[in-house]
Regions:
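Sec/Tat signal peptide C-region and signal peptidase I cleavage site
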Residues: 17-21
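Acidic, polar ligand-binding/catalytic clefts
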Residues: 63, 67, 71, 75-141, ...
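Extended ligand-binding regions for polar small-molecule ligands
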Residues: 60-63, 67-69, 131-135, 144-153, ...
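Bacterial N-terminal signal peptides
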Residues: 5-15
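Conserved C-terminal helix/tail region of periplasmic/extracytoplasmic solute-binding proteins
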Residues: 309-339
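Extracytoplasmic small-molecule ligand-binding "clamshell" domains
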Residues: 24, 29-99, 275, 279, ...
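Bilobed "Venus flytrap"/periplasmic-binding protein-like clamshell domains
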Residues: 35-44, 54-69, 103, 123-180, ...
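Sec/Tat-exported extracytoplasmic proteins
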Residues: 29-32, 65, 69-73, 94, ...
Length: 339
């Protein structure tokens, strides 16, 4: 009986320990900004204009975290990274978070010293071809076709697997930078270009002289769950990034938007009351205050708003929600309970 009492008392004591700031969060507060690694330029996900202003789905994730942690979505330093640079920058501490259309794989998660914090975009790899080639399906790709692809990516590995499985003997022409790969494709050096379908839509919209002259083939050849990642070794920072992402999803499900975030504090819905910090201080589990999620949503909107503005119906890409819709609308996205 005494042993049981000791176990219960110990469990209660552990549960009562408040979250404390880890080294990454301490560093962020000290320098007054989050250092976010992004793509060198991918419309809809991370792209800078001529004034150096960054926009995109991956960019908004970092802004949401900055709003939650620093009370200012603009306190972010952007570090553009190629596919080959991204993990080194994260591992070395050059950046605090990698939010750069990066696929969550077992080898990356288990052996690179990083933690993926969730899926912000469910994608899949596809092909783009000139309309004049009259290739309407991956099933019609001829043997020995040349394909432009960026090296150091899952895209390159998937292309090799697809070619071998279908006995196509495809000829990859690889480039370190995506800009070089797309330039080679549009100049006619390669017959096809391959990357994630969201990337194909972005590249066709942004870089093609006439987007109508290029078709994205309908079949997917892989699953590509894209999401942010952080260095291992700081559980507090990992939890913050993970739960801000989940919070944006939960906000969409329960109707918390950029426009009504303040007013929703008057809601009597138990879940909304928790999300807004009215009935429960969920921020204490993360080392943040109770209004962390309200600030994030006020800064960039909920997940649905972020999606539609950057890659969906309100963007030039006009991509469908598909798998990125909420679970109760036929998609794969949902958050664990925030409580």
């Amino acid at each position: 009986m005494k042993k049981l009492g000791l176990v219960v008392a110990t469990a209660l004591a552990v549960a009562a320990i408040p979250a404390h700031a880890g080294k990454v969060l301490d560093g962020i507060k000290s320098k007054g900004q989050i250092v976010c690694g992004v793509n060198t330029g991918l419309a809809g996900f991370s792209q800078a204009d001529s004034q150096g202003n960054w926009t995109g789905l991956d960019v908004d994730v970092c802004r949401a975290i900055a709003a939650a942690v620093l009370n200012d979505a603009n306190k972010v330093k952007w570090v553009p990274l190629t596919a080959q640079q991204r993990f080194t920058a994260l591992q070395s501490g050059e950046i605090d978070i990698l939010s750069r259309n990066t696929t969550w794989t077992m080898s990356r998660d288990a052996s690179l010293g990083v933690h993926f914090t969730g899926v912000t975009y469910y994608d899949g790899q596809g092909f783009m071809a000139p309309v004049k080639m009259k290739v309407a399906s991956t099933k019609k790709i001829a043997k020995g076709t040349t394909v432009c692809v960026q090296t150091g990516t899952t895209t390159e590995k998937n292309l090799t697997d697809f070619s071998r499985t279908n006995k196509l003997d495809l000829k990859p022409i690889v480039f370190e930078k995506q800009e070089a790969a797309t330039g080679a494709y549009f100049s006619g050096r390669c017959a096809l270009f391959t990357t994630d379908v969201s990337g194909l839509a972005s590249i066709r919209s942004k870089d093609a002289k006439n987007p109508a002259e290029h078709v994205i083939l309908p079949e997917l050849i892989s699953k590509e769950p894209l999401g942010p990642s952080v260095r291992r070794g700081d559980d507090e920072w990992f939890a913050i990034v993970k739960w801000v992402v989940y919070g944006l999803l939960e906000a969409e499900e329960y109707g918390l938007t950029q426009a009504n975030a303040d007013k929703m504090a008057d809601s009597t819905d138990p879940v909304v009351m928790r999300l807004t910090g009215k009935s429960e201080d969920t921020g204490k589990h993360l080392g943040l205050d109770k209004e962390w999620l309200v600030r994030a949503v006020k800064a960039v909107g909920n997940y649905g708003e972020i999606f539609e503005r950057n890659v969906g119906s309100k963007s030039p890409l006009n991509l469908p929600r598909g798998s990125n819709n909420l679970w109760n609308k036929g998609g794969l996205q949902y958050a664990p309970p925030i409580r």
